[in-house]
């Protein structure tokens, strides 16, 4: 969404994303509030800029420490379209997001963090308004929106929990 040179336009980027399908925003981003203003306006702006209120990874609930995001691969043509971004958002932790568009209507969004630690890593997601079903045994969330535009999200790591 922003990256190192444009972070003031949104929020410091750590692989933040939105997903639109069939004209519906399935994973809306909170965006940014305004550029400047009174103390009350700045309080709201700072709330919207927090890492934890965007579709991305956080460590111990903290804001990013660095915004050195890079695009590792952008392959928009061919049988599979692929986007890879990477950000060392926290000291000693690298976050890589890979999005594969496999066929019309099917994509895989893989968020990985590279670090051996006991610290709390959370993958923050904002679903659009509507029915969301949680299956804690399968580590799976599905949406039940009207129409064909829905989401199935499943966590695969052994220790991951919804």
At which residue positions do the language-model features occur?
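Cytochrome P450 core scaffold surrounding the K-helix E-X-X-R motif
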Residues: 27-30, 34-39
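Carbohydrate-active enzyme catalytic cores, enriched for enzymes
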Residues: 1-27, 76-77
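Histidine-centered metal-chelating micro-motifs
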Residues: 6, 34, 45
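Pocket-edge structural micro-motifs
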Residues: 1-4, 21, 29-30, 61, ...
